[in-house]
């Protein structure tokens, strides 16, 4: 095996890029880049039933969107898809058959299901029982001939050393070991369709591509002893393994499930909503790893420099949507305005809001946006009917000084010339109302904000009033005063 660090991300093209898979890719990427190694993309497409058209393109496109690059992939190298490597798998399966380390199995799915049912009914752990057990050579030959005559296509099974101990030092979990007798018996390495099973193909691929470290989710721990059996059978050195902890939903404490439709879990979803790739990259990098300290905002280059596999967490990583929203807002607030406006334009255009005020609106709401698509609901005030007040807003507007403030401020706006109606001239008018009425603070600003915008929170009030326009602002004040009578 090479001394150079070589890691891989090996997705199945079965759909969109899930945030858990994105984390696997990202940690492999950070590990390779930190150590000056190679990051490889390999496509594991042996499960033809689950193959999704365009699945590979979607995976690579979303990895690129996140800002990752790679050194080797199906785009630049031949035979980096498992479906292109069948001859290589056959070579090693034939070798194991010739050496007596594997054999052809003619047991049917129906027979396996019946045996499994019997074992469960008897309270036994389900396992494959060697179909040739107790047969003489002649009986075995007759059995095979009969099965072949019936048109039964065999699988190929690896012989399991039931007394063997399969152990490794996991970079995250520490020492782990499995007994060969607990694996479930001889297992299939080649299916009836001639395709290898995952646990066989992945070993051949990792060895052939000289992968030095396998970094993946801890749902693969149970696969590792089977893979170690293949390494042993073929006389190869196994790579180092690191199994990252699972990702849980911070609200439920349960494993993040693709079936949980209340949580956005696919990178494509975040792209469509206008999350910034730098923010999503930063957020995912902290799912099960942190560099220490209080800071949580890091550039891609900083994360590469800081990445330390010894700080991979042993506890589940909590997926917190609110934290991602906070982080994305931090990136949006600090981004160049022209960048944010360019990202916001398609959303405004789709909503029919790409007016001459568009730039000012994006500038006004840039500090508030948790995702770029929020520019549409945030600007409803300027394009839709006045919103229905919440109970909290209604309660506040029931205050006895509210009509006094609104009447005084309406008079101030009416007295302003169109030429003077600018953001910088509106705040002094509010202060003038304070001086005249003696009402200040929340009791001054909140009635004006609610009357003009229908909300208790928002961007700078003078900017909102200016963009709303003099006529519309006065109309909103009059309407509110009428409601308060």
UniProtKB/Swiss-Prot annotation:
Tagged with keyword ATP-binding: yes
UniProt-listed InterPro entries: aa-tRNA-synth_I_cd-bd, aa-tRNA-synth_I_codon-bd_sub2, aa-tRNA-synth_I_CS, aa_tRNA-synth_I_cd-bd_sf, Glu-tRNA-ligase_bac/mito, Glu/Gln-tRNA-synth, Glu/Gln-tRNA-synth_Ib_cat-dom, GluQ/Sye
Motif ('HIGH' region): 11-21
Gene Ontology biological process terms, A to Z: glutamyl-tRNA aminoacylation
Binding-site positions, ATP: 258
Reactions accelerated catalytically: tRNA(Glu) + L-glutamate + ATP = L-glutamyl-tRNA(Glu) + AMP + diphosphate
Localization of this protein: Cytoplasm
GO terms for MF: ATP binding; glutamate-tRNA ligase activity; tRNA binding; zinc ion binding
SUPFAM superfamilies, sorted: An anticodon-binding domain of class I aminoacyl-tRNA synthetases (SSF48163), Nucleotidylyl transferase (SSF52374)
Motif ('KMSKS' region): 255-259
Keywords: Aminoacyl-tRNA synthetase, ATP-binding, Cytoplasm, Ligase, Nucleotide-binding, Protein biosynthesis
Gene Ontology cellular component terms for the protein in this record: cytosol
UniProt-listed Enzyme Commission number(s): 6.1.1.17
NCBIfam families per UniProt: gltX_bact (TIGR00464)
HAMAP family: Glu_tRNA_synth_type1
Chain's role: Catalyzes the attachment of glutamate to tRNA(Glu) in a two-step reaction: glutamate is first activated by ATP to form Glu-AMP and then transferred to the acceptor end of tRNA(Glu).
Similarity comment: family membership: Belongs to the class-I aminoacyl-tRNA synthetase family. Glutamate--tRNA ligase type 1 subfamily.
Subunit structure: Monomer.
Protein name: Glutamate--tRNA ligase
């Amino acid at each position: 095996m090479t001394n150079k660090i070589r890691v891989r991300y090996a997705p199945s093209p079965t759909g969109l890029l899930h945030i858990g898979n994105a984390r696997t890719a990202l940690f492999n990427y950070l590990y390779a880049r930190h150590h000056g190694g190679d990051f490889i993309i390999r496509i594991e497409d042996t499960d033809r039933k689950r193959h999704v058209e365009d699945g590979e393109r979607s995976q690579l496109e979303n990895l690129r969107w996140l800002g990752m690059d790679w050194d080797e992939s199906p785009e630049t190298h031949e035979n980096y898809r498992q479906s292109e490597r069948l001859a290589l798998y056959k070579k090693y399966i034939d070798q194991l058959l010739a050496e007596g380390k594997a054999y052809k199995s003619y047991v049917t799915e129906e027979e396996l299901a019946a045996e499994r049912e019997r074992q469960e009914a008897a309270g036994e752990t389900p396992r494959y029982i060697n179909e040739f057990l107790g047969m003489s050579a002649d009986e075995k030959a007759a059995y095979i001939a009969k099965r072949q005559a019936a048109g039964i296509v065999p699988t190929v099974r690896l012989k399991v050393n039931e007394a063997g101990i399969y152990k490794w030092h996991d970079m995250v979990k520490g020492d782990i070991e499995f007994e060969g007798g607990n694996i479930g018996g001889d297992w299939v390495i080649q299916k009836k369709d001639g395709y290898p099973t995952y646990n066989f193909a992945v070993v051949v691929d990792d060895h052939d591509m000289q992968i030095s470290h396998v970094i993946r989710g801890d749902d693969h721990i149970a696969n590792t002893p089977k893979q170690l059996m293949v390494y042993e059978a073929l006389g190869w050195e196994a790579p180092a393994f690191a199994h990252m902890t699972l990702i849980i939903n911070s609200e439920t404490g349960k494993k993040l499930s693709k079936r949980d439709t209340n949580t956005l879990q696919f990178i494509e979803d975040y792209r469509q909503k206008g999350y910034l790739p730098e923010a999503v990259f930063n957020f995912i990098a902290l799912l099960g790893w942190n560099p220490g300290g209080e800071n949580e905002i890091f550039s891609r280059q900083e994360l590469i420099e800081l990445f330390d596999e010894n700080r991979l967490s042993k506890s589940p990583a909590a997926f917190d949507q609110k934290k991602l929203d906070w982080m994305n807002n931090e990136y949006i607030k600090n981004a160049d305005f022209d960048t944010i406006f360019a990202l916001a334009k398609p959303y405004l255009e789709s909503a029919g809001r790409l007016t001459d005020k568009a730039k000012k609106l994006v500038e006004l709401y840039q500090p508030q946006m948790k995702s770029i698509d929020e520019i549409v609901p945030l600007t409803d005030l300027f394009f839709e009917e006045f919103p229905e007040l919440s109970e909290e807003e209604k309660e506040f507007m029931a205050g006895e000084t509210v009509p006094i403030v609104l009447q005084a401020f309406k008079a101030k706006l009416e007295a302003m010339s169109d030429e003077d109606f600018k953001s910088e001239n509106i705040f002094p008018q509010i202060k003038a109302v304070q001086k005249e009425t003696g009402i200040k603070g929340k009791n001054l600003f909140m009635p004006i904000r609610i009357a003009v915008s229908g909300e208790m929170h928002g961007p700078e009030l003078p900017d909102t009033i200016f963009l709303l326009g003099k006529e519309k602002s006065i109309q909103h004040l009059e309407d509110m005063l009428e409601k308060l009578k």
